[in-house]
């Protein structure tokens, strides 16, 4: 069995062809090796980015409408693997996770939590937009169950429920860290976008990667709420509740950090 996790997915990649070379050409290479080695089962981690800015509650049958090169190339990779699967007695399980977080994961959720912990966080927009999230411990458990399933061809979004709006998420993290809730300073959406475009201009001129960009602010303020049929995978039940997963992550990263823990940089 091949579990295909590799991808270029940062939103500040300087050469757009990096997405094509890794996500598409790299996947084609893996499929070819599977043919040569007679490997007949693959689990492919794609992304909900293939749906773009989808309607809230989008499921696995939602229209494919990626808004960036990451989503486009990941769907192209899916199509390559579907062709591979259809050419013989082969099994393909495609998993489309939403944003993943957890201990040791340096991604967008960690960046948000770090800003809150530092006291420098500024809320942008009304904060009522919902965000689907996925805890790494649950994603790993789901992929592990994919290894043993007898299904031959399936697509699953991976989402941990319930979806939280940004106000609730920020308040929950701030309460755990500081013993008080509230969301602190706030900018309007349009002012936040002005800051984002200014940051984009500076990044282009200086060649520096900045933590703020227009696309990141747009994604932060958008609703990205998805539904999932993951329970159809042999009755799968995630081992961690979302609320507990957030608490575990905040505690591990900011309250009782382990200096020897391995770190994975995904953003």
Q: Across the structure, where does each feature detected by a protein language model lie?
A:
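Flexible, glycine-rich beta-alpha linker
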Residues: 51-52, 90-111
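Conserved Rossmann-fold NAD(P)-dependent oxidoreductase catalytic core, especially the SDR/UDP-sugar
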Residues: 29-69, 93
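Substrate-positioning beta->alpha
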Residues: 29, 105-111, 125-147, 154, ...
């Amino acid at each position: 069995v091949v579990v295909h996790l590799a991808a270029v997915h940062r939103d500040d990649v300087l050469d757009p062809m990096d997405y094509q070379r890794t996500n598409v050409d790299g996947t084609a290479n893996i499929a070819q090796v599977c043919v040569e080695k007679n490997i007949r089962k693959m689990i492919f981690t794609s992304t909900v980015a293939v749906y773009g800015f989808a309607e809230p509650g989008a499921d696995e049958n939602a229209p494919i409408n990626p808004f960036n090169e990451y989503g486009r190339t990941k769907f192209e990779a899916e199509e390559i693997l579907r062709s591979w699967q259809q050419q013989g007695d082969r099994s393909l399980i495609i998993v489309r996770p939403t944003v993943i977080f957890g201990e040791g994961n340096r991604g967008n959720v960690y960046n948000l939590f770090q800003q809150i912990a530092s006291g420098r966080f500024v809320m942008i927009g009304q904060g009522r937009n919902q965000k689907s999230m996925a805890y790494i411990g649950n994603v790993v458990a789901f992929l592990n169950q994919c290894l043993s399933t007898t299904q031959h061809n399936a697509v699953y979004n991976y989402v941990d429920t319930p979806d939280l709006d940004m106000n609730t998420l920020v308040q929950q993290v701030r309460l755990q860290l500081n013993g008080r809730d509230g969301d602190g300073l706030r900018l309007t959406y349009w002012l936040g976008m002005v800051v984002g475009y200014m940051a984009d201009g500076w990044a282009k001129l200086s060649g520096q990667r900045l933590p703020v960009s227009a696309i990141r602010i747009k994604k932060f303020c958008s609703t990205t709420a998805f539904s999932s049929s993951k329970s159809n995978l042999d009755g799968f039940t995630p081992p961690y509740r979302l609320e507990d997963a957030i608490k575990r992550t905040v505690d591990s990263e900011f309250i009782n950090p382990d200096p020897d823990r391995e770190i994975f940089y995904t953003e």
